[in-house]
Amino acid sequence: MKTIYLIGGTMGVGKTTVSQQLKKELPNSVFLDGDWCWDADPFQVTEETKAMVMRNICFLLNSFLHCTAYKNIIFCWVMHEQSIIDEIINSLDTGNARVIKISLMIDETNLRKRLSADIARGIRSNDVIDRSVARINMYQILDTIKVDTVNKNVYEIVSEILTL
């Protein structure tokens, strides 16, 4: 049986870092960052582009699920609404897969510190802080396993995920 990990969280919580390390820890694993399916300039949020990114994500995840080379599929994306998670899961062929839905959690103070450091390094723009902070509480109500990232390094977070 395969396992697919859906890892959500607000911008800057550490989804990509955790997912990359999880990929190294799990055998026969593959990783998809949802941002790779919608990397455009200018970034346009319309009904058409939202439908397109969902098709892109589900096509790739189903390709991984059907590929015999992979046992563990890791997907990360913001996924701040239950409807997004549900649409992805309902579009996947999970008959031979265990689905683990995770939300990486953080408090506002620590999120601001992480994002400010990213801004200082030129990785993110200034406007990300308010947008990301506004989404923190949205993850509390999702049907996901909550993994707290505060005062933990990536290895501790991954170790916790590996026990699920």
What label would you give each PLM region?
Residues 7:
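Hydrophobic anchor at the beta1->P-loop junction of P-loop NTPases
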Residues 10:
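P-loop (Walker A) phosphate-binding loop of NTP-binding proteins
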Residues 13:
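ATP-binding Walker
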Residues 16:
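Walker A/P-loop
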Residues 19-62:
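Conserved substrate/cofactor phosphate-moiety recognition/catalytic segment
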Residues 52-96:
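Glycine-rich phosphate-binding loop used to anchor ATP phosphates in small-molecule kinases
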Residues 95-115:
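Conserved phosphate-donor/acceptor-positioning beta-strand/loop module used by diverse small-molecule
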Residues 117-160:
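Small-molecule kinase domains that catalyze NTP-dependent phosphoryl transfer to phosphate-bearing small molecules
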